[in-house]
């Protein structure tokens, strides 16, 4: 994917008057003939879920609420929680909980 150095828009590959491939900008007159084979590959490292959500310490900085722990071996009624919109915007937010006592985690949609 190439971008126009003049206006910054995405360049398309088009065939010029001589039948050669060229990068053309749809919004300005920028035209760049392609004279060599162009290829580049970028591999991105996928982040771990803990990196995105903040890791182990993320829950401790959140609010607490009264909710019964879903771990059957725990009788605690307090949990840290946060909400995320992980589905489409017309769906309700998902609430993630972590027990303050046993550290058990669960979610409600």
Curated annotation (Swiss-Prot):
It holds the Pfam family Zn_ribbon_RPB9. A zinc finger (C4-type) spans 4-28. Its main location: nucleus. GO terms for biological process: termination of RNA polymerase III transcription; tRNA 3'-end processing. A zinc finger (TFIIS-type) spans 65-107. DNA-dependent RNA polymerase catalyzes the transcription of DNA into RNA using the four ribonucleoside triphosphates as substrates. Component of RNA polymerase III which synthesizes small RNAs, such as 5S rRNA and tRNAs. SUPFAM superfamilies: Zinc beta-ribbon (SSF57783). PANTHER family: DNA-DIRECTED RNA POLYMERASE (PTHR11239), DNA-DIRECTED RNA POLYMERASE III SUBUNIT RPC10 (PTHR11239:SF12). It comes from the Eukaryota. It is found in: Nucleus, Nucleolus. Belongs to the archaeal RpoM/eukaryotic RPA12/RPB9/RPC11 RNA polymerase family. GO terms for cellular component: cytosol; nucleolus; nucleus; RNA polymerase III complex. Zn(2+) 2 binds at residues 69, 74, 99, 102. Transmembrane segments: none annotated. The gene is rpc11. Zn(2+) 1 binds at residues 4, 7, 25, 28. InterPro entries: DNA-dir_RNA_pol-M_15_CS, Rpa12/Rpb9/Rpc10/TFS, Zn_ribbon_RPB9, Zn_ribbon_RPC11_C, Znf_TFIIS. One of its GO terms (molecular function) is zinc ion binding. CDD domains: Zn-ribbon_RPC11. The keyword Acetylation does not apply. This is DNA-directed RNA polymerase III subunit RPC10. Component of the RNA polymerase III (Pol III) complex consisting of 17 subunits. Keywords: DNA-directed RNA polymerase, Metal-binding, Nucleus, Transcription, Zinc, Zinc-finger.
């Amino acid at each position: 994917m190439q971008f126009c150095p003049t206006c910054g828009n995405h360049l398309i590959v088009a065939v010029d008057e001589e039948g050669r491939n060229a990068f053309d900008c749809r919004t300005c007159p920028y035209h760049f003939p392609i004279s060599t084979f162009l290829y580049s590959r970028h591999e991105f490292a996928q982040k771990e879920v803990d990196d995105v959500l903040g890791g182990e310490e993320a829950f401790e900085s959140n609010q607490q609420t009264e909710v019964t722990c879903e771990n059957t071996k725990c009788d605690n009624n307090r949990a840290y929680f946060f909400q995320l919109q992980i589905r489409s915007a017309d769906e309700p937010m998902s609430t993630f909980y972590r027990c303050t006592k046993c550290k058990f985690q669960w979610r409600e949609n």
